[in-house]
A protein has these predicted regions:
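Short, hydrophobic/aliphatic alpha-helical segments
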Residues: 27-35, 64, 165-175, 273
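N- or domain-start disorder-to-order transition segments that initiate the globular core
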Residues: 1-26
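Conserved nucleotide- and phosphate/pyrophosphate-binding catalytic cores
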Residues: 197-384
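N-terminal catalytic cores of NTP/NDP-binding nucleotidyl/phosphoryl-transfer enzymes
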Residues: 17-78, 182-188, 194
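Well-ordered mid-protein domain cores that form the structural environment of catalytic cofactors
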Residues: 58-108
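Flexible loop/turn segments at secondary-structure boundaries
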Residues: 40-41, 73-75, 123-125, 215-218, ...
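Buried hydrophobic packing segments
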Residues: 50-57, 167, 190-198, 255, ...
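Divalent-metal (Mg2+/Mn2+/Ca2+)-assisted nucleotide/phosphate chemistry catalytic cores
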Residues: 11, 87-210, 217-219
Length: 384
């Protein structure tokens, strides 16, 4: 008998009601779809939540189809956005997609997985087929989306390509003959549009199963790699542990339930809860030995108020002054120069214990040389 509780664990909605049970009763492997646009290089623990549901289906004999949206990324999902997304380059899409495949297989069963690029079918549609696709939905129906409605009422631009996005995602379901589609709660509209388009193409419509979205470590914004507010499943153990420990206390119940799939609630003491979460999270993705080492390193840094013994020594570039955002990005202490500037403006970059001011982007070489550098939770030494 199918274990429905395992399949729907932590699900927010399963639509239509009773449809998943009916499909399971057919006794054949279901085709379970999850689409991810490769807008960043790493899968974070929030994106792992629906991937875990896909693995639960695979463990019961069903087929998981992970669709990397290399074609839809050229449009960008407008869900939850107040303005049009910037279009990504083909080179960036291809690079990110390769990493998504690699990381997703840390969660999924390779033997029960199909890993696909939606350019396989979307790139072949002719204009006649696109017109057929657009006839499956009305503009008034599209404007029912909260994000489109809000932008329309405030005279914010909405491109026709954005209107096409939910239809492109829906056509993915047609192309692979999806029985179930997984997605975050912000994807409910797109998932239900997939049902409508499948019906228009003469297919049995998919079940829509939505999973919760979680906030990133700052506790304010949703977890997002593009915002730099995330914990990546491929983060190094020490970095993963540090990000977990820097998370706001209020996140722990959701993080335990959704990211660890823990049955018991977190400890009542906030610090103990975060330590246990950080250790268990690193253990989940890197193993017990790495978790123990990360915890020990954290204790050396923060309990003893000093950098770890193996803090890297960073060579200064030529020139004076040193442009700090470039220096941090070049040494992988920030994901980009823009992220480095944000860290500086937030007081998150310190030289010998003193935070750099928001306008201190260029620092004299003499001040940098030999200094202890702290960026967020990480330490380094600058060569003298």
């Amino acid at each position: 008998m199918p274990d429905l509780a395992a399949l729907t664990r932590n699900a927010v909605k399963v639509l239509p009601e009773g449809e998943l049970e009916r499909k399971l009763a057919l006794g054949r492997p279901l085709r379970v779809k999850l689409g991810i646009d490769p807008t960043a290089r790493d899968i974070h623990i929030g994106q792992a939540i629906p991937l875990q549901r896909m693995r639960a289906f695979q463990d019961q004999g069903h087929t998981g189809i992970l669709i990397v949206g290399d074609y839809t990324a050229r449009v960008g999902d407008p869900s939850g956005r107040s303005k049009e997304r910037q279009v990504m380059s083909g080179e960036q899409i291809d690079e990110n997609a390769a990493r998504y495949f690699e990381q997703a297989l840390r969660i999924l069963d390779r033997d029960r997985s199909e890993l696909r690029f939606n350019s396989e079918w979307l790139g072949k549609l002719d204009f006649g087929e696109i017109l057929r696709l657009t006839r499956t939905i009305t503009v008034s129906r599209l404007l029912e989306r909260n994000d489109f409605e809000r932008r329309f009422k405030t005279n914010q631009p909405i491109s026709v390509s954005e209107f096409l996005y939910p239809l492109m995602q829906a056509y993915d379901s047609v192309a692979i003959k999806a029985d179930v589609e997984l997605g975050g709660t912000d994807q409910e509209y797109n998932l239900l549009t997939g049902r409508d388009v499948q019906i228009a193409y003469g297919q049995e419509p998919q079940v829509a199963l939505t999973t919760p979205l979680i906030n990133g470590p700052n506790g304010v914004d949703k977890m997002s790699a593009s915002l730099g507010n995330y914990i990546g499943i491929d983060d190094p153990p020490a970095e993963m542990y540090g990000k977990a420990m820097s998370s706001v206390d209020a996140l722990m119940p959701d993080y335990y339930r959704l990211c660890l799939e823990a049955d018991a609630p977190p400890p009542a003491d906030p610090y103990a809860a975060k330590r246990e979460f950080a250790r268990r999270l690193v253990e989940r993705w890197h193993g017990a030995e790495a978790a123990a080492a990360a915890e020990a390193g954290f204790d050396r840094m923060f309990k003893e108020k000093r950098a770890t013994d193996d803090a890297p020594v960073l060579e200064l570039p030529d020139g004076d002054p040193v442009h700090v955002p470039a220096f941090l990005a070049d040494h992988s202490l920030a994901g980009s120069r823009g992220e480095a500037r944000r860290l500086i403006s937030q007081g998150g970059v310190r030289l010998d214990g003193e935070p750099l001011a928001a306008d201190e982007l260029d620092v004299p070489r003499s001040r940098m040389a030999g200094a202890e550098l702290r960026v967020g939770r990480r330490f380094a030494r600058v060569a003298g």
